[in-house]
Design a protein with these regions (language model features):
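PRPP-associated nucleotide enzymes
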Residues: 1-154
Length: 154
């Protein structure tokens, strides 16, 4: 990634598959103290891989998803256009109630907008992410690595 393509981000933080796997396992180890969970709700798409790793490590078999759009861009498949800061649930979770006993997993909490939207739907769920930026850190219950707000993670 060139400096020009970073845009608003002063730093870049490339994450290999191996590093993501190691860090997601570390997330699972931190979550072990919070067991039992009824299951996992992965925030698509970024939370899918970490959720699978966490589920395997914690021996959780029930995995649901919630699909949330929170970044500006047009998606040709469903023609969603949004401005940054708006959040839209494309596919809700099948979990009933307030989320008590459930674990929500995402790869990154950035501004916290997605996390706040999901938290509003499932206020009693335990929210975990692999990476957290300062603006969204307070929304998650458990995370592994904090990165600065001006860092692009890819």
């Amino acid at each position: 990634m060139s400096d020009d393509s970073l845009g608003q981000f002063a730093k870049s933080f490339p994450v290999s598959w191996e590093e993501l796997h190691r860090t997601a396992k570390a997330l699972a180890w931190r979550l072990a103290d919070h067991l039992p969970f009824n299951g996992i709700i992965a925030i698509t798409r970024g939370g899918l891989v970490p959720a699978a790793i966490v589920a395997r490590e914690l021996e959780l078999r029930v995995i649901d998803t919630i699909s949330v759009v929170s970044y500006g861009a047009a998606d040709e498949r469903d023609m969603v256009q949004k401005e940054r800061g708006q959040v839209r649930v494309l596919k809700p979770t099948q979990v009933d109630g307030d989320g008590a006993g459930w674990l929500i997993v995402d790869d990154l909490v950035d501004t916290g907008e997605t996390a706040r939207a999901v938290r509003a739907l499932l206020p009693q769920a335990h929210f975990a992410s692999v990476y957290a930026k300062p603006a969204g850190r307070s929304v998650v219950d458990t995370f592994v690595t904090e990165v600065s707000q001006d860092t692009w993670i890819y």
